[in-house]
Regions:
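Short terminal targeting/anchoring segments
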Residues: 1-54, 59
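Short amphipathic alpha-helical segments
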Residues: 36, 40, 82-86, 138, ...
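Extracytoplasmic
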Residues: 50-52, 59-61, 67, 74, ...
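Short beta-strand/turn micro-motifs at beta-sheet edges
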Residues: 54, 100-102, 181-183
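Soluble periplasmic/extracytoplasmic beta-strand elements of cell-envelope proteins
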Residues: 54-56, 63-69, 110-114, 168-170, ...
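Short, solvent-exposed beta-strand/turn patches at coil↔beta or beta↔helix junctions
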Residues: 60-91, 120-135
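Periplasmic peptidoglycan-binding/anchoring modules of Gram-negative envelope and division proteins
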Residues: 72, 76-113, 147-152, 158, ...
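Periplasmic OmpA-like peptidoglycan-binding domain that tethers envelope proteins to the cell wall
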Residues: 81, 114-201
Length: 203
């Protein structure tokens, strides 16, 4: 006969095994995700250096940060001539570093283009909620402008389908400011970020 003690011991062992499996699986996925992002960062840094293009890249996450002044006029969401000139150099380097990399190209699920603003108020009588939503609109429209330029410009025709499947946009308003010594750095907070979202369980 199986005693109640034996039954409970067996159940505990089953739960322990399930917990360990889940824990290890999550850690493997995180390791793969971190490795892919580190790989993308290294590949992009090398490509940008070769092509003499400047960008701020987080070596651990692969996130690219582009200052608003590189792309837009103040409080505008249409790309400036300077912005188009910059993207004409940056985007081919960015795309090539991702889609010509054998390790990365099958692991990328989405490319998130995310707009950010600072928390300074627009001129006029607006409530805090209205100010936040105006910044939301500006940040979203700026992300859209970059994505639109990335997809529509001629040099990406070889990757057109891939970009349409992966590029998504998001407006973060002033929700994630860049802090320096505990205070918001307005200039650094106004930016467009490009982030990679990796597929899960890719061998």
């Amino acid at each position: 006969w199986i005693t109640m003690t034996d039954l409970m011991t067996g159940l505990v062992l089953v739960f322990v095994v399930m917990f360990l499996y889940s824990f290890l699986q999550n850690n493997v996925e995180k390791f793969q995700d971190d490795l892919a992002k580190e790989n993308s960062s290294k590949a992009l840094q090398e490509t940008l250096k070769e092509r003499n293009v400047e960008a701020i890249i987080d070596s651990a996450t692969g996130i690219v940060k582009i200052s608003d002044l590189e792309l837009f006029e103040i409080n505008k969401s249409d790309l400036s001539p300077k912005g188009k000139e910059y993207l004409d150099k940056f985007i081919p380097a960015y795309i090539d570093s991702l889609f010509e990399n054998d390790y990365l190209k099958g692991r990328i699920d989405k490319i998130l283009i995310q707009g950010h603003t600072d928390s300074q108020n627009f001129a006029g009588q607006f409530t805090e909620d209205e100010q936040y939503m105006k910044n939301m609109e500006l940040s979203l429209n700026r992300a859209y402008s970059v994505a639109n330029y990335m997809i529509k410009t001629p040099y990406n025709k070889n990757y057109g389908k891939k970009l349409r499947e992966t590029v998504i946009v998001e407006g973060a308003s002033s929700s994630t400011p860049v802090l320096v010594n505990g205070k918001e750095d307005f200039a650094k907070s106004r930016r467009v970020e490009l982030k990679l979202i990796m597929k899960k369980n890719v061998k």
